[in-house]
């Protein structure tokens, strides 16, 4: 990829998408519906729910971010920042709870980090129409060398980068 040739990342991203904090209940429900479409219906990582929303106990202490498509104004992606519980900082973040044996404490030891300054980024979800191209396999994410483009036609993965920024 020829990043310097891509141009201004923010301007290019803003042509197609806007990112907003999901602070209203209505917007949070839209985020939970996107997560359900991706994690439950498409990928089968979680069980489907009659309300067609995917949520868990960490959502109450999370900041939810929504990705809105400029073309039609609908929410097409999301991500969340799980914060440590201010009333019970000893409560673990999802990664700490689910992957405790995988954490290399010689690199970082969560027990030594200020709990109030720590968050976990999780539940990144993008509707398949915005994540996949025609001809992609049934895999959740298909990336190839061509995705980065060429010198004559550079490309950049705006959606995941935009959600993480």
Q: For the regions a protein language model found, what residue spans apply to each?
A:
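Short amphipathic alpha-helix that is part of the acyltransferase structural core
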Residues: 4-52, 57-60, 64-68, 75, ...
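Amphipathic alpha-helical interaction segments
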Residues: 72-74, 88
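Acyl-donor binding region in acyl/amide transferases
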Residues: 86-165
């Amino acid at each position: 990829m020829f990043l310097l040739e891509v141009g201004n990342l923010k301007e290019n991203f803003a042509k197609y998408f806007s990112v907003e904090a999901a602070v209203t209940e209505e917007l949070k429900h839209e985020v939970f519906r996107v997560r359900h479409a991706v994690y439950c219906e498409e990928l089968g990582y979680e069980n489907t729910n009659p309300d067609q929303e995917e949520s868990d106990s960490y959502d109450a202490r999370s900041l939810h971010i929504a990705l809105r498509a400029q073309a039609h104004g609908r929410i097409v992606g999301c991500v969340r920042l799980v914060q440590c519980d201010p009333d019970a900082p000893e409560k673990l973040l999802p990664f700490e709870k689910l992957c405790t044996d995988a954490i290399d404490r010689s690199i970082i030891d969560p027990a030594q980090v200020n709990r109030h300054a720590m968050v976990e980024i999780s539940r990144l979800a993008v509707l398949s129409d915005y994540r996949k191209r025609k001809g992609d396999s049934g895999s959740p994410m298909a990336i190839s060398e061509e995705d980065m483009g060429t010198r004559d036609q550079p490309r950049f993965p705006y959606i995941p980068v935009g959600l993480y920024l």
